[in-house]
Swiss-Prot record:
It comes from Pseudantechinus bilarni. Belongs to the protamine P1 family. GO terms for molecular function: DNA binding. It is found in: Nucleus; Chromosome. This is Sperm protamine P1. GO terms for cellular component: nucleosome; nucleus. Keywords: Chromosome, Developmental protein, Differentiation, DNA condensation, DNA-binding, Nucleosome core, Nucleus, Spermatogenesis. One of its GO terms (biological process) is chromosome condensation. The lineage of its organism: Eukaryota, Metazoa, Chordata, Craniata, Vertebrata. Residues 1-62 are annotated as: Disordered. Testis.
Amino acid sequence: MARYRRHSRSRSRSRYRRRRRRRSRHRNRRRTYRRSRRHSRRRRGRRRGYSRRRYSRRGRRR
């Protein structure tokens, strides 16, 4: 029984770690996306087609 308990404990620990890491990553991504979107409006006037195409592709992928 001790062996099983030990295994489950380590498993849950790794799970928690992954969840925490993923959450922080997502938060950062959201922030950068908002910032880039704000600044992208100014650059859109110079390179309309290229910048727009690249941005839309990136948003869909992420």
